Amino acid sequence: MQRLKWRRARLGLWAIVAVCGVWTAGAASPSNTAPDANQATGANAPAVGKPTPLDRYLDDMRTLRATFQQTLTDAHGREIDRARGTLIVVRPGKFSWEIHPQGNGTGQLMVADGRNLWFLDRDLQQVTVKPIDAALSATPAMLLSGTIDVRRSFKMTPAGKRDGLDWVLVEPQGAEADFRRALLGFDGDELKRMILEDKLGQTASVIFDHVERNGHVAPEEVAFVPPPGVDVIGTPRK
């Protein structure tokens, strides 16, 4: 169970990549026919170097609020977890990610406050905290910083059209990253789906709804104070 929680947490960090896409309310229905990253070539694949929907959006997102559904499968395609959650982002470098599993469990909360990354496991009454630069250095969440050269950290390639969506493949440039690739599906300038794969072959499929882009986010929504009585592991950066 604890291992599954950390899978959700790690995939939650990857999901922050999606906040750099173009958003509107609504989401496409899940499909088992999304393009394989190894098939991102051919007649339907635009030339590498052509600006993607993800490229076009990176410059103008300030805040985002959305709910999402996430399905986690193992390397054999078997479903091992299904959950719903909420995501709030304030660029640069702040977000709140909360997820509630289907069935038992009270869920987890992850907050980046600009200095530290906090992870609250309500079932264990435990908080883990790390400096944000160390915690996110090898994840797509670096895209939140707004200060890095995205093309140096991630390779973004048009991956063709399928199921009515234009797909963008995102791959880490460095070997130290703990994920293999992310596929983002766009309908015009609207991000509809995201598929994430880690180095163990586990895959998360994410769809989004009730999305508000560049709306107001109160400071306390991307801040964290440990609840009374919980164990705190780690030392926050002041």
Q: What residue spans do the PLM features occupy?
A:
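N-terminal secretory signal peptides that target proteins for export/translocation
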Residues: M1-R8
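Bacterial N-terminal signal peptides
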Residues: G12-W23
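N-terminal leader/targeting segments and the immediate start of mature chains
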Residues: V17, G26-R82, V90, P226-K238
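Extracytoplasmic
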Residues: M61-T63, R82-R84, V90-P92, G105-G107, ...
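An acidic-aromatic
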Residues: T86-A138, A204-S205
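Gly/Pro-enriched, hydrophobic low-complexity segments
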Residues: T128, D149-K238
